[in-house]
Design a protein with these regions (language model features):
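S-adenosyl-L-methionine-dependent methyltransferase catalytic module, highlighting the catalytic core
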Residues: 35-36, 40, 50-162
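Flexible, glycine-/basic-rich loop-and-beta segments that form/coincide
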Residues: 166
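Conserved SAM-binding loop
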Residues: 1-64, 158-163
Length: 166
């Protein structure tokens, strides 16, 4: 059978087929309605189907703003208030924003993601963080094991979610 690509809105469009596998890479940190997306994934998968998910950087990590706030220092987007960031951004740009989410960032924390995954209908078959070949990744992985630093030194998530067979 040939592969066919279609552009569809996951939450608005209807799908006439179910899937065995869903793959998503570097999108969840931009997705504003993740619980609904996870529910839709669940509905679209066949029993036993899997969602392979990888994404980052997470918002509270050193570059979690993806540079979109135009702040030059690591974690400054977490340190400064949203009000200050928006005011500074709007002063420098013709396309004005009212909230950080207008820059295409969900602002979900690592804690938020863990909660959304655990509260979803899925079984979590695999869950790992801070996957990188970069030397700083190893240091961040160590620092993320310290409880109060976990949120700020966890920069990506890779997981496999499985739809339970009924």
């Amino acid at each position: 059978e040939k592969i066919k690509f279609e552009e569809k809105d996951l939450l608005k469009d209807n799908f006439d087929k179910k899937f065995d596998i869903i793959v998503t890479k570097d999108t969840f940190e931009h997705s504003l309605n993740l619980p609904n997306i996870l529910n839709k994934f669940y509905d679209l998968l066949n029993d036993g189907g899997k969602a392979y998910i990888g994404f980052g950087p997470l918002y509270n990590s050193y570059n979690g703003d993806h540079g979109r706030t135009q702040l030059r220092l690591p974690w400054l987007h977490v340190i400064l208030s949203e009000k200050i960031i928006i005011k500074r951004y709007n002063k420098k740009n013709s396309n004005k924003i009212n909230r950080i989410e207008d820059l295409g960032l969900s602002k979900y924390s690592f804690k938020d993601y863990k909660k959304m995954f655990s509260e979803s209908k899925f079984d979590i078959d695999y869950f790992i963080t801070n996957q990188s070949d970069h030397p700083i990744g190893k240091a961040f992985n160590i620092l993320s094991k310290i409880n109060f630093l976990e949120e700020y030194f966890t920069f990506n998530i890779y997981c496999i979610l499985r739809k339970i067979k009924i």
